[in-house]
Design a protein with these regions (language model features):
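Membrane-interface transmembrane-helix boundary segments in multi-pass integral membrane proteins
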Residues: 1-4, 142-145, 161-199
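N-terminal topogenic module of multi-pass integral membrane proteins
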Residues: 1-25
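Membrane-interfacial loop-to-transmembrane alpha-helix junctions, especially the N-terminal start
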Residues: 21-32, 79-85
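Membrane-interface helix caps and helix-loop-helix hairpins in membrane proteins
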Residues: 46-53, 75-79, 99-111
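Structural signature of hydrophobic alpha-helical transmembrane segments
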Residues: 1-3, 49-62, 82-85
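Aromatic-anchored segments of alpha-helical transmembrane domains
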Residues: 33-43, 88-99, 147-158
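A contiguous pocket-lining binding segment that forms or flanks enzyme active sites
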Residues: 97-147
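Hydrophobic cores of alpha-helical transmembrane segments in multi-pass inner/ER membrane proteins
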Residues: 2-11, 63-74, 116-129, 187-205
Length: 232
């Protein structure tokens, strides 16, 4: 999909070539846009009567990505930026390319879905490549273990509600990477292994293209965040 690439590239180019106070307002605006799409989907489900505890609780990984992306944009906490980056460039990108979406254009769910999915990818690109908050050493493993913890939370939600959060009880209806990983439950360990591989690939590509984290605060006694004009 070209639009996420164009928007991500534009935000990165602007942040690197013309840093300034506009970056703060861009972060706030993008956070509000992601929230509008994310929350708007739940509001729409309530209005049309499709909301249910089996399918509508915020237990999918994309829910975590949305929340983390918003928090990362507003606070620029390094751990949040790293999670937003790794999750957006793996899970969210895959969900954008192969959406498990029952509604097509011009449904409101089509717009809300792509608003917060594409928004998360743009946010990750802006923060990591535009603001140069590159992942620290070990970040990929932190993202992996936190992902497993979220999956465990989703599994508890599945047991309580009878739902299928994070597709732990059944594969998506529409084609995705899980479709080629065998039947339940074998696609679950395969999916975990693939997730780790993708995280390592993203981390490796980031470093190969010059994405090296700044010296840590513990090492030099100063904040590890890049000094930008809008950071107080």
């Amino acid at each position: 999909m070209p639009r996420p690439i164009v928007r991500s590239a534009a935000s990165v180019w602007g942040a690197r070539r013309h840093p300034g106070p506009w970056m703060r307002w861009f972060s706030v605006g993008l956070a509000l846009l992601i929230f509008a799409g994310w929350a708007g989907e739940y509001v729409a489900e309530v209005i049309v009567g499709t909301w249910s505890v089996q399918y509508s609780l915020p237990l999918q990984l994309t829910d975590a990505v949305s929340a983390v992306s918003i928090a990362a944009l507003l606070t620029r906490r390094q751990l949040l930026v790293e999670l937003a980056y790794f999750w957006s460039y793996t899970a969210t990108l895959q969900a954008t390319l192969t959406p498990d979406l029952g509604q097509n254009f011009p449904s409101v769910f089509y717009f809300t879905y792509f608003t917060y999915h594409v928004g998360a990818i743009v946010a990750a690109s802006f923060l990591v490549f535009g603001c140069r908050q590159y992942p620290r050493p070990g970040a990929v493993w932190r993202a992996f273990w936190i992902s497993l913890a979220w999956a465990a939370l989703a599994g508890i939600g599945d047991l309580i509600t009878g739902g299928n959060y994070m597709y732990l009880r059944a594969r998506p209806v529409h084609n995705s990477l899980l479709s080629v990983m065998g039947p339940w439950p074998w696609y679950i360990p395969s999916g975990i292994a693939l997730a780790l591989v993708l995280l390592l690939v993203v981390d490796g590509l980031t470093r190969a293209f010059g994405g090296v984290a700044a010296v840590t605060a513990e090492a030099d006694g100063r904040s590890a965040r890049p000094r930008l004009p809008w950071v107080m």
